[in-house]
Amino acid sequence: MAWKRTVSVKALENAGGQIAVNVDGNVIFIARGKDGLHGLNAVCSHARCILGIFEEDTMTVRCSCHGARFEVTTGKMIEPPSVAPNAPMEKLGLKVYNVRDNAGFLEVDVD
């Protein structure tokens, strides 16, 4: 395991329980859900937009560009983007990361 320190827990709280951070050149979306901290690649697999709408009731995150929705626990795309009906598309998931609170700072396991 290679834990990397990111932002303070207070910064996550101030951002409404969701935040995107840069860890070694990777943008990672972190959200505090009802069952703890979750992290996943913050770049949508459809059009490379940054994710940003965490829905705690469904434990999903939505891409603000085209509406694709991903499970925060698995990274699986559960709702494809809203694009032209005949547009070619792959339902690619996102990498998930373990996240922990260590002495008031969020750490991400980048392995």
From Swiss-Prot:
Coiled coil: none
This protein's GO CC annotations: cytoplasm
Cofactor: [2Fe-2S] cluster
Binding positions ([2Fe-2S] cluster): C44, H46, C63, H66
The keyword Transport appears for this protein: yes
Gene3D superfamilies the UniProt entry points to: Rieske [2Fe-2S] iron-sulphur domain
Keywords, ordered alphabetically: 2Fe-2S, Cytoplasm, Electron transport, Iron, Iron-sulfur, Metal-binding, Oxidoreductase, Transport
Annotated cofactor note: Binds 1 [2Fe-2S] cluster per subunit.
UniProt keyword Transport, yes or no: yes
Signal sequence, start to end: none
Domain Rieske per the UniProt entry, residue ranges: 3-108
Record-linked Pfam families: Rieske
Cellular localisation: Cytoplasm
GO terms for MF: 2 iron, 2 sulfur cluster binding; metal ion binding; oxidoreductase activity
Family membership: Belongs to the SDX family.
Name recorded for this polypeptide: Probable sulredoxin
